[in-house]
């Protein structure tokens, strides 16, 4: 059973080097034959969207797909994709997955935060054609992309995974949560052994990466309802060009009424006190779990649990909500009942 069908991939580049109008007409033709063959089991059709900030692609593809179509067809698509990778040092050099300094740490996180601008600006164009948000933005390739590990096949794109990747994951997932009215799906490009993977394998050995543990904490947001939230931040960083906020967050409530707060601390060295006000809720129980280590920490086949989820008990219930201190270089999940 196929739930989602992508009609082409990266057609602006390796998928045909097409211009947007040509691709959109090809999409209209071929999507015709992606049919539902069973009542109640809709195959969602995903149109190839832009690479990074190619807003012209988004505009022209939607214009062509919506031309001479009926409103109920919403451009003959259920989703429009977006691809964005974080290359700390640029496309040609990219940079090491494990050997980096504080400048590169903040540069990487600054580039991860760019995802929000991409979602907003592509979203504005989508709103012109699809104000009811019938079409999901599908961020189906994202994550960090470094120079592959020394001694490995360059074509396999094998890279290690550190606390830096854990922060990129937490930052990005918080952004997706906050824009879940438009972002309906998002996918790390590869799950195992490639780029920002969640698992690394070698023969019969397997290790969970720091990214895996962040995803494991964030799973409680899935199928939950977004809760409006904001946080006071300060700007940090080592270079003027690559400043970042010290904290990011997102909040949801699940079907059982349990509140889930996820917060990232982007600082390499500073912890911060968070005094959270929670409205319309009498707090009875609080639990916390955290992924935190120094910025270069990673899991290896020799030391598989260097970075993992640990209990976080430093959460106080206050009259207005919660108070806690989030350690440097960490991703925190707090459950509130």
Residue positions per predicted region:
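Aromatic-lined, polymer-binding surfaces characteristic
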Residues: 2-6, 11-23, 27, 45
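Conserved, mostly hydrophobic/aromatic
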Residues: 5, 30, 80, 122, ...
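Flexible loop/turn segments at secondary-structure boundaries
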Residues: 8-15, 52-57, 86-91, 143-149, ...
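Generic recognition of flexible, low-complexity loop/linker segments
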Residues: 18, 34, 68-70, 124-129, ...
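Noncatalytic carbohydrate-binding groove/subsite architecture in carbohydrate-active enzymes
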Residues: 20-170, 232-242
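Aromatic/acidic polysaccharide-binding cleft in carbohydrate-active enzymes
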Residues: 134-249
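C-terminal beta-sandwich/jelly-roll accessory domains of carbohydrate-active enzymes
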Residues: 230-235, 239-244, 264-337
């Amino acid at each position: 059973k196929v739930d989602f069908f992508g009609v082409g991939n990266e057609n602006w580049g390796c998928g045909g080097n097409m211009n947007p109008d040509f691709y959109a007409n090809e999409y209209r033709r071929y999507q015709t034959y992606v049919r539902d063959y069973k009542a109640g089991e809709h195959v969602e059709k995903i149109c190839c969207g832009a690479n990074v900030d190619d807003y012209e692609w988004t505009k022209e593809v939607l214009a062509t797909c919506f031309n001479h179509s009926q409103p109920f067809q919403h451009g003959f698509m259920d989703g429009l994709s977006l691809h964005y990778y974080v290359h700390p040092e640029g496309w040609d050099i990219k940079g090491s997955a494990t050997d980096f300094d504080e400048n590169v740490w903040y540069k990487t996180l600054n580039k991860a935060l760019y995802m929000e601008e991409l979602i907003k600006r592509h979203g504005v164009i989508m709103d012109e054609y699809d104000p009811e948000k019938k079409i999901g933005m599908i961020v189906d390739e994202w994550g960090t992309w470094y120079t592959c590990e020394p001694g490995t096949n360059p074509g396999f794109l094998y890279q290690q995974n550190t606390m830096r990747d854990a922060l990129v994951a937490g930052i990005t997932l918080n952004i997706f949560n906050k824009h879940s009215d438009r972002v309906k799906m998002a996918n790390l490009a590869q799950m195992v052994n490639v780029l920002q993977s969640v698992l690394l394998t070698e023969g019969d050995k397997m290790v969970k990466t720091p990214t895996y543990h962040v995803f494991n904490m964030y799973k409680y947001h899935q199928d939950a309802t977004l809760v409006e939230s904001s946080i006071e931040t300060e700007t940090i960083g080592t270079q003027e060009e690559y400043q970042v906020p010290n904290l990011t967050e997102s909040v949801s409530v699940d079907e059982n009424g349990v509140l889930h707060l996820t917060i990232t601390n982007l600082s390499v060295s500073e912890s911060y006190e968070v005094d959270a006000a929670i409205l319309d809720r009498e707090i009875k129980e609080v639990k916390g779990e955290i992924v935190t280590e120094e910025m270069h920490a990673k899991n290896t086949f020799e030391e598989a649990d260097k970075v993992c989820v640990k209990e976080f008990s430093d959460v106080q219930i206050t009259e207005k909500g919660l108070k806690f201190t989030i350690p440097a270089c960490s991703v925190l999940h707090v459950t509130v009942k």
